[in-house]
């Protein structure tokens, strides 16, 4: 069967112009205009999706099939083009019957054209074919437009669903244009309103805990570039201007009490010659109580010192992926569970904004894995937030899973984050030694997010950074009171 793409080529119908008109009409629709005004960050993300829409529409037109009636009419037209005028005159009755049988829009006009001319000339033959071709072009264009209109309605419905989802999650997960673009890409999955409301719920909880949100931001920034002074720096001569009181003051600007003998007032000096007042003079001299002239003046001089040449090497700290291990034991239930999930949501927000990966592992009696920054990140986040914390604590398995992941090339610069109350058994010696080796040789960094003030120091000693967020009732009340 004839495809629409082939028909367009045969009749020289420009499908590109039709596609562009459809996309412009879609972007100018009132629904998108209101959305772009409300969420300007997502406007760029949706605009970046236009090439994908264009390619999908081309593919749809290319694969579309032409109706059998139109296919038969086109074949008849092609055969008629090959006929000479005498042959065309012989075949004309069959052609008119075929057009009538196919209910062609050209059938009635063709019969009127033939009836209006008693003799079929070469010019009439050419005119007949030209008008027939125009009729076929109109039919092909109409077919393209109908198909594109169906695609437009379907695409608009899909975009509206994704806009609803992205609009709900944008305040929670999109911190900049990069995050907005990745969020839009993730919204392509089949999600219902009730599903992503769980993310909205934990986003609202995170906003109610600004200290927790701030902790996640500090952890995310913990690999900023650092300047390191060199130890082998050479000495250099450094000259600077220093301001000092002048040895020869410029002017008298008042009186003051001091012990400056050279600037004594004459009455004070006269008391020194009176025997009865001599001791009084010395007492006031010791106490700096003598009246003296206050002189004003200052001078500048050049000071030359030797100091090391300051050169700094900037140690660019790569911001790699997050590998987050979350303790799902029974002691992490309740408020601890809410805080742990909200903290992971905050790390997901940072990962989206900085184009990083965020990989979650839940450790209990078994390990469950989620990647929150992948194409299915929203679905993965919903599954993670739906988990219940009711298992046991197996920190050793958690660390082994982290170390196995760090062996992979794509995770070599990852930051490992463990969220727990750290009320658990001590780690085996082989695990501890392996962690220290990764820290020393590969500069991997291990972060602890402690949800309790009673975590075991022996376990937490192996971490590079310990971020404390006590979830005890006293700490919660203090945080609320400070807010």
Swiss-Prot record:
A GO CC annotation given for this chain: membrane
Encoding gene (name): viaA
Subcellular location: Cytoplasm; Cell inner membrane
Annotated domain remarks: A protomer can be divided into three domains: a highly alpha helical N-terminal domain (NTV), a flexible middle domain (MD) and a C-terminal VWA domain (CTV). The MD domain interacts with the triple-helical domain of RavA and increases its ATPase activity. Interacts with free FrdA through the C-terminal VWA domain. The C-terminus region also mediates interactions with phospholipids at the inner membrane.
HAMAP family assigned to the protein according to its UniProt record, in alphabetical order: ViaA
Similarity section: Belongs to the ViaA family.
Region (N-terminal domain NTV) residue spans: 1-191
Pfam families: VWA_CoxE
Species this protein is from: Escherichia coli (strain K12)
The protein's name in its UniProt record: Regulatory protein ViaA
Region VWA domain: start-end pairs: 312-483
Region span, Flexible middle domain MD: 192-311
Keywords assigned by UniProt, alphabetized: Cell inner membrane, Cell membrane, Chaperone, Cytoplasm, Membrane
Mutant lacking the gene: phenotype: The double ravA-viaA deletion mutant shows increased persistence when grown in the presence of fumarate and kanamycin.
S-S bridge residues: none
Xref: InterPro entries: Uncharacterised_CoxE (IPR008912), Uncharacterised_ViaA (IPR023481), VWF_A (IPR002035), vWFA_dom_sf (IPR036465)
Induction: Part of the ravA-viaA operon, which is under the direct control of sigma S in aerobically grown cells. In cells grown under oxygen-limiting conditions, expression is largely dependent on the anaerobic transcriptional regulator Fnr. The operon is coexpressed with multiple anaerobic respiratory genes, many of which are regulated by Fnr.
Subcellular location, principal: cytoplasm
Alphabetized SUPFAM superfamilies for the sequence: vWA-like
Topology relative to the membrane: Peripheral membrane protein
């Amino acid at each position: 069967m004839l495809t629409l793409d082939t028909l367009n080529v045969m009749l020289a119908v420009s499908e590109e112009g039709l596609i562009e008109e459809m996309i412009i009409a879609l972007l100018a629709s009132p629904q998108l205009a209101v959305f772009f005004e409300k969420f300007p960050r997502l406007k760029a993300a949706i605009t970046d999706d236009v090439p994908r829409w264009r390619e999908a529409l081309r593919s749809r037109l290319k694969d579309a099939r032409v109706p059998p009636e139109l296919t038969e009419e086109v074949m008849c037209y092609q055969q008629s083009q090959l006929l000479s005028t005498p042959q065309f005159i012989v075949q004309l009755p069959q052609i008119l019957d075929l057009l009538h049988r196919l209910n062609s829009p050209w059938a009635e006009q063709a019969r009127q054209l033939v009836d209006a001319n008693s003799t079929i000339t070469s010019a009439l033959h050419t005119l007949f074919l030209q008008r027939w071709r125009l009729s076929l072009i109109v039919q092909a264009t109409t077919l393209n437009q109908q198909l594109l209109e169906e695609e437009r309605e379907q695409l608009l419905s899909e975009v509206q669903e994704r806009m609803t989802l992205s609009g709900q999650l944008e305040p929670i997960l999109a911190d900049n244009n990069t995050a907005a673009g990745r969020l839009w890409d993730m919204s392509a999955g089949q999600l219902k309103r009730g599903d992503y409301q769980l993310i909205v719920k934990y986003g609202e909880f995170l906003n109610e805990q600004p200290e927790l949100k701030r902790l996640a931001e500090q952890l995310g920034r913990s690999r900023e570039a650092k300047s390191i002074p060199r130890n082998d720096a050479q000495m250099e001569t450094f000259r600077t201007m220093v301001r000092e009181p002048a040895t020869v003051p410029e002017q008298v600007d008042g009186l003051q009490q001091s012990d400056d003998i050279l600037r004594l007032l004459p009455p004070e000096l006269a008391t020194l010659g009176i025997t009865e007042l001599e001791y009084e003079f010395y007492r006031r001299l010791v106490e700096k109580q003598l009246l003296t002239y206050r002189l004003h003046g200052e001078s500048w001089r050049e000071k030359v010192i030797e100091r090391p040449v300051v050169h700094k090497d900037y140690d660019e700290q790569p911001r790699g992926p997050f590998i987050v291990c979350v303790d799902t034991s029974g002691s992490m239930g309740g408020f601890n569970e809410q805080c742990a999930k909200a903290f992971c949501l905050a790390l997901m927000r940072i990962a989206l904004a900085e184009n990083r990966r965020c990989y979650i592992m839940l450790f209990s009696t078994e390990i469950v894995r989620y990647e929150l920054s992948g194409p299915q990140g929203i679905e993965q986040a919903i599954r993670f937030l739906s988990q219940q914390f009711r298992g046991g604590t197996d920190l050793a398995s958690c660390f082994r899973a982290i170390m196995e992941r760090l062996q992979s090339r794509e995770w070599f610069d990852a930051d490992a984050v463990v969220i727990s109350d750290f009320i658990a058994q001590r780690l085996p010696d082989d695990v501890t030694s392996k962690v220290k080796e990764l820290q020393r040789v590969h500069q991997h960094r291990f972060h602890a997010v402690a949800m309790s003030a009673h975590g075991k120091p022996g376990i937490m000693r192996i971490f590079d950074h310990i971020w404390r967020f006590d979830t005890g009732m006293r700490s919660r009340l203090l945080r609320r009171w400070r807010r």
